[in-house]
Amino acid sequence: MPRSRINGNFIDKTSSIVANILLQIIPTTSGEKRAFTYYRDGMLAQSEGNYAEALQNYYEATRLEIDPYDRSYILYNIGLIHTSNGEHTKALEYYFRALERNPFLPQAFNNMAVICHYRGEQAILQGDSEIAEAWFDQAAEYWKQAIALTPGNYIEAQNWLKITKRFEFE
C-alpha cells in the first residue's frame, strides 16, 4: 500500500483531508479506493519532483483503476512525467492511450503538439526541412483538436497556426 503523505501546505493538507473523507463516504469498490490512493500519492510525488515514485504509484493505479475516464488522467500524468524526462516517444504513447479513453483532454492534444513542434525544430537544426514540415503539420493537427475542445485557450498555438497559415480562424 502506498504511503499517504500530507504536505505542510495548508491547501495541500485540506485537499488531503477532503480526499480521505471522500474515499470513505463515496460508494466505490476497495480496488477503486486503492487506485485513487495510488493516484493521489502519484500526484503528490510528481508535484515534489519525485518522478520515479510518481511513476510507481501511477503504474499501480492503472493496474487497479477500471474506469476509463479515471484511467485517462492517470495515463496523461504518466505522459507528463515522460515529457519532463525528455522521453517524447513514451510521452506520446501515454497521451494517445489517455485520449483513447477520454477524447476530451485538450491538454493531451496540446502536449502532443508541443512535442511534434519541438521535433520539427530539431529537424530544422539537422537540416531536414521536409521532416520538419511533417512534424509541424502534425503539431498543427493536434493544436487544432485542442483548440476545438477549448476555443479560448492555447492563444500562442492559435497565433502560430495563423502565422504559418496552417489554420484560419473566423
From Swiss-Prot:
| A biological process term (GO) from this entry | photosynthesis
Q: Report keywords, A-Z.
A: Chloroplast, Membrane, Photosynthesis, Plastid, Repeat, Thylakoid, TPR repeat
InterPro entries, per this entry? Answer: PSI_Ycf3_assembly, TPR-like_helical_dom_sf, TPR_rpt, Ycf3/AcsC/BcsC/TPR_MFPF
Query: Looking at the record's lineage, which domain of life comes first?
Result: Eukaryota
TPR repeat ranges?
A: 35-68, 72-105, 120-153
Presence of the UniProt keyword Nucleotide-binding in the record: no
Q: Which PROSITE patterns match?
A: TPR, TPR_REGION
Membrane association type? Peripheral membrane protein
- Just give the chief location class: plastid
The yes or no answer to whether the keyword Thylakoid is present is yes
GO cellular component, alphabetical, reads: chloroplast thylakoid membrane
Cellular compartment(s):
Plastid, Chloroplast thylakoid membrane
Q: What's this protein's family per the entry?
A: Belongs to the Ycf3 family.
Tell me, what does this protein do in biology? Essential for the assembly of the photosystem I (PSI) complex. May act as a chaperone-like factor to guide the assembly of the PSI subunits.
| Name by which UniProt lists this protein | Photosystem I assembly protein Ycf3
Q: Which organism is the protein's source?
A: Saccharum officinarum (Sugarcane)
